Each structure stands twice: as C-alpha cells, then as structure tokens.
C-alpha cells in the first residue's frame, strides 16, 4: 500500500477528498486511492456507505450533482445488500461523480 493510501486509511473522512477529486476531474487518482481502501479491507460496507453519504453532503458541487450521487448511493446500498461487489459499486459512484458536473438535465 502506498503512503498516500495509509494516510487515507487513517482518516475515513478523507472519502470526501476521494469524491471531490472525482468531481474535479482526477478520476484515476480518486479510483486508485479508493481501490487501496478496498484492498486494505479496513472498513465495512456500512461504514463506507455512511462515509460516502457524509461526503456527498459536504462535497463542493451543484445540488443537482449531489442529488444524482444520493440516488446512486441508494442503488449501491441495494446492490451491496444483494451481495454485489463493493469495489465495482463504489467505483461506479466515483465515475458518476466524475461525469455528473458535465451532464445537463435530469439523470434518467
């Protein structure tokens, strides 16, 4: 694990930083840092859901983007409850964060 990931692991609130990086266009770095968290296995799915919920609330972006992220987080929660892969689900959330600031209109 890289030193940057260890710093992230020590402070779960840095999920906010990971999400903000995705929104700001640094999807590769955001994804890499999140993958390190998953590989480490430090947090349960419920803890990650809570951290992402808090991060969406605090992230700097338009309300429309936050709404899309909350909807996706609801879907992530549902899929994880049915045995889905946390890595795939949360990375999909990060990619939505990456593209959402550039989308127009309502997500369908």
What are these regions (language model features)?
Residues 1-13:
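Long, charge-dense, solvent-exposed interaction surfaces that engage phosphate-rich ligands
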Residues 19-108:
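Helix-rich C-terminal "collar"/helical-bundle subdomain used as an assembly and partner-interaction module
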Residues 14-18:
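Alpha-helical tetratricopeptide repeat
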């Amino acid at each position: 694990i890289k030193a940057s990931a260890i710093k992230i692991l020590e402070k779960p609130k840095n999920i906010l930083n990971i999400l903000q990086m995705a929104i700001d266009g640094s999807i590769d770095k955001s994804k890499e840092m999140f993958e390190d968290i998953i590989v480490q296995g430090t947090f349960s799915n419920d803890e990650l859901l809570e951290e992402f919920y808090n991060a969406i609330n605090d992230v700097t972006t338009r309300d429309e983007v936050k709404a899309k992220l909350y909807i996706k987080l609801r879907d992530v929660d549902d899929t994880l409850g049915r045995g889905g892969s946390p890595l795939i689900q949360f990375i999909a959330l990060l990619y939505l964060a990456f593209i959402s600031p550039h989308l127009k209109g309502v997500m369908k």
